[in-house]
Amino acid sequence: MKGPPTFCSLLLLSLLLSPDPTAAFLLPPSTACCTQLYRKPLSDKLLRKVIQVELQEADGDCHLQAFVLHLAQRSICIHPQNPSLSQWFEHQERKLHGTLPKLNFGMLRKMG
């Protein structure tokens, strides 16, 4: 019965000594990438359900640039040049601009 406790001890030791906890595992963490992009106009009903928006870059992990709209139950990958998404972003900017007058949206675009 020395085998399993020794393995567990070594695994625990590698977790404790590693500066990155995920580095102790043999398999890298998987990342979810958009593989298909929605290009059709987006409904107002769908856009009202958006909780968070994330930009997926076309880099080493993912090969498509997309906006990921996170809803309560799912996420949708949207083409970056979708006109209805652009209009929604402008509407959100105007809405936020009314509540946060000192926020510089031009600077946010440069950072994003």
From Swiss-Prot:
Swiss-Prot/TrEMBL GO biological process terms: antimicrobial humoral immune response mediated by antimicrobial peptide; cell-cell signaling; cellular response to lipopolysaccharide; chemotaxis; immune response; inflammatory response; neutrophil chemotaxis
Lineage of source species: Eukaryota, Metazoa, Chordata, Craniata, Vertebrata
Keywords: Cytokine, Disulfide bond, Secreted, Signal
Protein localization: Secreted
A molecular-function term among this protein's GO annotations: CXCR chemokine receptor binding
Gene Ontology CC terms: extracellular region; extracellular space
Cleaved signal peptide residues: 1-24
Family as reported in the entry's similarity comment: Belongs to the intercrine beta (chemokine CC) family.
Tissue/organ expression: Testis, thymus, placenta, ovary and skin.
Annotated disulfide bonds: 33-62, 34-77
Protein known as: C-C motif chemokine 27
InterPro entries: Chemokine_IL8-like_dom, Interleukin_8-like_sf
Pfam families: IL8 (PF00048)
Organism: Homo sapiens
Function in brief: Chemotactic factor that attracts skin-associated memory T-lymphocytes. May play a role in mediating homing of lymphocytes to cutaneous sites. Binds to CCR10.
Subunit structure: Monomer, dimer, and tetramer. Heparin avidly promotes oligomerization. Interacts with TNFAIP6 (via Link domain).
Statement: the UniProt record of this protein carries the keyword Ion transport: no
Superkingdom field: Eukaryota
